[in-house]
């Protein structure tokens, strides 16, 4: 499938997968991509499948002229769902933000390296 930006979706998916464990292929749609990051475990005592995490998720869409994006912050709960929630604790906030910034830099670099190059534009 060719995207509005002129890039094949399969090639973009391969490139996005190479960015790390962020892309959630099952939650992507035709021109929309979903990324997330489980940055900080809330409590390591429960079994791994029952743990909750503080982190971020990103909705990215190919609009043709650019990729529009919107980040959200919150809690990844025991049911495997994101809930937009205020992150607690200065150290936790820093870790989540640092993880997001590191990813964003790599994403921007990847999009600029495409031929034709693409840019990121925050959704208003």
UniProtKB/Swiss-Prot annotation:
Record-linked InterPro entries: Tscrpt_reg_Crl (IPR009986), Tscrpt_reg_Crl_sf (IPR038208)
Protein localization: Cytoplasm
Annotated GO biological process: positive regulation of DNA-templated transcription
Signal peptide as annotated in the record: none
Alphabetized UniProt keyword annotations: Activator, Coiled coil, Cytoplasm, Transcription, Transcription regulation
Region Essential for activity: start-end pairs: 99-118
Domain of life (superkingdom): Bacteria
Stored Gene3D superfamilies: Sigma factor-binding protein Crl monomer
Record carries keyword Cytoplasm: yes
Coiled coil: 90-115
Annotated GO CC locations: cytoplasm
Family: Belongs to the Crl family.
Function: Binds to the sigma-S subunit of RNA polymerase, activating expression of sigma-S-regulated genes. Stimulates RNA polymerase holoenzyme formation and may bind to several other sigma factors, such as sigma-70 and sigma-32.
NCBIfam families, per database record: PRK10984.1 (NF008217)
Protein name, per record: Sigma factor-binding protein Crl
